[in-house]
Amino acid sequence: MSKISLTQVQKMKQSGEKIAMITAYDATFARLFDDEGVHSILVGDSLGMVVQGHNDTLPVTVNDMVYHTANVARGVQNALLIADLPFMSYSDVHSACINAGRLMAAGAKMVKIEGGDWLCDTVKQLNRNGIPVCAHLGLTPQSVHLFGGFRIQGRDAQRAEEIYHHALALQTAGVQMVVLECVPEQLAERITKALRIPVIGIGAGAQTDGQVLVMQDALGVTTGYIPKFSKNFLAETGDVRKAIQLYVEQVANGQFPAAEHTFN
């Protein structure tokens, strides 16, 4: 696989080619995922839960994200590397630019932020500083306490319209990609069709431009609560490399996510 740039990912949307994204937190897994054809690797603040053992992502710091982004970057040759800005690290435009700059210096090619149209000025300023932005809408884990837990978003008409509006506003502001988490498939399809930029789903059905999974979910090593939208690809293959190959293949041909991984 040749090097995947943001331009190439956007062309994949235009051509209908599905985008396979997965999280990674170290160089070894990043290299393996890169070798097996994953298009994009996300250094997620999910590391707070799956690496550090917290109950949510809120304790993750910018220093944590810089450390893991640098580790992952050393293992990536081709995939588009995206890194999360953690909780409260982009609460104002100045902080967002400083902290995003640190992630880019560590090797990220794009940063991801959680939230809606109130972030438009932040997105514009990040773009002015040469930093591409991915927006995260729907179930945004940094707002878990505001939502009253990890709950599906957009099932009622008002909330669905809000999410749709935020997606359009953020695209206008300059966002180059959107992650939609835990929203009904019908809403995800509507947003995907409305946007020019790639829409990556996690628990958002099969009509998005691509899928992302936490690596521990994809490899079946998550303990405790197992999200409905996850699938254990290792169980079908018995080999980590083959599991990732199967994930990329099933995203590409539309087999994943299936109906049992989808919310309506």
Swiss-Prot record:
One of its GO terms (molecular function) is 3-methyl-2-oxobutanoate hydroxymethyltransferase activity. It catalyses: 3-methyl-2-oxobutanoate + (6R)-5,10-methylene-5,6,7,8-tetrahydrofolate + H2O = 2-dehydropantoate + (6S)-5,6,7,8-tetrahydrofolate. Pathway: Cofactor biosynthesis; (R)-pantothenate biosynthesis; (R)-pantoate from 3-methyl-2-oxobutanoate: step 1/2. Its main location: cytoplasm. Its cofactor is Mg(2+). Its EC number is 2.1.2.11. The keyword Magnesium applies. It holds the Pfam family Pantoate_transf. It is found in: Cytoplasm. 3-methyl-2-oxobutanoate binds at D45, S46, D84, K112. Gene3D superfamilies: Phosphoenolpyruvate-binding domains. The keyword Ion transport does not apply. GO terms for biological process: pantothenate biosynthetic process. Binds 1 Mg(2+) ion per subunit. Mg(2+) binds at D45, D84, E114. One of its GO terms (cellular component) is cytoplasm. Keywords: Cytoplasm, Magnesium, Metal-binding, Pantothenate biosynthesis, Transferase. InterPro entries: Pantoate_hydroxy_MeTrfase (IPR003700), Pyrv/PenolPyrv_kinase-like_dom (IPR015813), Pyrv_kinase-like_dom_sf (IPR040442). The active site is at E181. Catalyzes the reversible reaction in which hydroxymethyl group from 5,10-methylenetetrahydrofolate is transferred onto alpha-ketoisovalerate to form ketopantoate. Homodecamer; pentamer of dimers. Belongs to the PanB family. This is 3-methyl-2-oxobutanoate hydroxymethyltransferase. It comes from Tolumonas auensis (strain DSM 9187 / NBRC 110442 / TA 4).
